[in-house]
Amino acid sequence: MKAVRLAVIDYDAGNLHSACKGLERAGAEVQLVTEPAGLAAFDGLVLPGDGAFDPAMQQLRARGFGEAIRQAIERQQPFLGICIGLQVLFEDSEEGTEPGLGIVPGRVQRFRPEPGLRIPHMGWNQLHLTQPDSPLWAGIPEQSWVYFVHSYHAVPKDPSWVVATTQHGSQTCVAAIARGTLFATQFHPEKSGPVGLKILQNFVEFVARRLPAAGA
């Protein structure tokens, strides 16, 4: 079977190396890309990263990736966002003043303070699969443990975007969104052990199913 070729977008955000290694373990051929030229030639795109909303958006726009990502999603090129790569898909964030990509209507909000609640939400937590038939969740049991690091969480205007949630204190927050060929996780699958590797494999296999058959 032809290897799935994924472009991992390098926009000076953290955690790119771990994401690349995770995707390679999941069976993909991975290339870091620093400019948008040629993105359409890849089988899928991945936008990982740690960090704050405003610097992420500034770097994406400065490198020309903002419009390129929108165009890729419009042409139904498979896309996986991770952590800040999920948040920048939204319209804006309470963390800063930069506009987001606006692909998903809604905004990113800070966790409300609660007695005894630690912010950031950091460490292992369980997934509630609100759409268990999503391609991301093939072979993933309800209440699987995955790894989070974030102080802000996305709130889509249309709840049908949400394919998994998690609980932090009394607050239910988005753990993953998906629609069509767009997928994004607030947690870090590349840091989530065997469950995370399976989720990355599910994305790679989703991309592979869309490739032309050999000899076609």
Swiss-Prot record:
Catalysed reactions, as listed in the record = 5-[(5-phospho-1-deoxy-D-ribulos-1-ylimino)methylamino]-1-(5-phospho-beta-D-ribosyl)imidazole-4-carboxamide + L-glutamine = D-erythro-1-(imidazol-4-yl)glycerol 3-phosphate + 5-amino-1-(5-phospho-beta-D-ribosyl)imidazole-4-carboxamide + L-glutamate + H(+); L-glutamine + H2O = L-glutamate + NH4(+)
Q: What GO MF terms are annotated?
A: glutaminase activity; imidazoleglycerol-phosphate synthase activity; lyase activity
Q: What is its EC number?
A: 4.3.2.10, 3.5.1.2
Q: Where located?
A: Cytoplasm
Q: Which domain of life does this protein belong to? A: Bacteria
SUPFAM superfamilies, per the entry: Class I glutamine amidotransferase-like (SSF52317)
Q: Which CDD domains match?
A: GATase1_IGP_Synthase
Q: In which pathway does it act?
A: Amino-acid biosynthesis; L-histidine biosynthesis; L-histidine from 5-phospho-alpha-D-ribose 1-diphosphate: step 5/9
* Domain Glutamine amidotransferase type-1 residues, every copy: 5-213
One cellular-component annotation, GO: cytoplasm
Chief localization class? cytoplasm
**According to its UniProt record, which residues of this chain constitute the active site?**
83 (nucleophile), 188, 190
- Gene Ontology BP annotations: L-histidine biosynthetic process
UniProt keyword Cytoplasm present: yes
Report the InterPro entries cross-referenced here: Class_I_gatase-like (IPR029062), GATASE (IPR017926), Imidazole-glycPsynth_HisH (IPR010139)
On assembly, the entry states: Heterodimer of HisH and HisF.
Protein name per its UniProtKB record: Imidazole glycerol phosphate synthase subunit HisH
Tell me what gene encodes this.
hisH
